[in-house]
Amino acid sequence: MARTSESSPYVEFDRKQWRTLRKSTPLVLTEEELYGLRGLGEQIDLEEVAEVYLPLSRLIHLQVAARQRLFAATATFLGEKHPDQQVPFVIGVAGSVAVGKSTTARVLQALLARWEHHPRVDLVTTDGFLYPTAELNRRGIMHRKGFPESYDRRKLLRFVTEVKSGAEEVAAPVYSHISYDIIPGQYHLIRQPDILIIEGLNVLQTGPRLMVSDLFDFSIYVDARIEDIENWYIQRFLALRKTSFSDPDAHFHHYAGLSDRDATSAAQEIWHNINRPNLVENILPTRPRATLVLRKDANHSINRLRLRKL
């Protein structure tokens, strides 16, 4: 049985307990499709999809239906003409750099789009809402890129508000990991999705004013030991020398020719000066706000889950 207590707002599961909640949900993802969704260094396989992500997709499917009934009831109370109009269900996915939240978001998008009644599932990363490099330099915070103040939070809030309000088309800026900057004039157009997934480091942040997390209907925090995340970050950094960093136009091209020793040293410096402080100061404190916490072991596999019941 799942572990819970009357004084805790959470129900805790190990993977064996969680997988029973899949019920009869079919596995509709192929190995070829999963390969295209898997991030660099990620070890997710179809077994994990079946045992972790299928029960999660079932839970969200049930919550989408319940939320639409709630919106319809409110619309009926207000005397609106179209009480059955769908309101986009918004999911936030948070976690550290290198923890695998992008893979989680992509797999979830693929599974949710196969459920009846909500085939239109869009995914947007908050990278597109970073201030452009020129603006970060103007503000003197280029060294704080990825920290909350490096994002145009008003723009992100306005974007999600417009999507959730039913706007026919809303544009999200596009970020390039090659140029390490916003791509001028390029946008990801969102057209009235059934579900919108917002993935990013700081999406569960709170504040004295309305924040984007206040608009989420469901939220996920991808968690792991800090020491494991550091190791994953370093291994990913080493692998990027032969992929993204090898592009002559890449912002980090100067790392491509480093030896393993020098690349490891560079990755450790970036981790301890930027990514670890951001995780400890800003990202990790938002974990209690998540509807569901996915806890990874050192081998990247999800083996524990914590679901908020209140």
UniProtKB/Swiss-Prot annotation:
Pathway: Cofactor biosynthesis; coenzyme A biosynthesis; CoA from (R)-pantothenate: step 1/5. Keywords: ATP-binding, Coenzyme A biosynthesis, Cytoplasm, Kinase, Nucleotide-binding, Transferase. ATP binds at G95, S96, V97, A98, V99, G100, K101, S102. Its EC number is 2.7.1.33. Gene3D superfamilies: P-loop containing nucleotide triphosphate hydrolases. GO terms for molecular function: ATP binding; pantothenate kinase activity. Belongs to the prokaryotic pantothenate kinase family. The gene is coaA. This is Pantothenate kinase. It comes from Rhodococcus opacus (strain B4). It holds the Pfam family PRK.
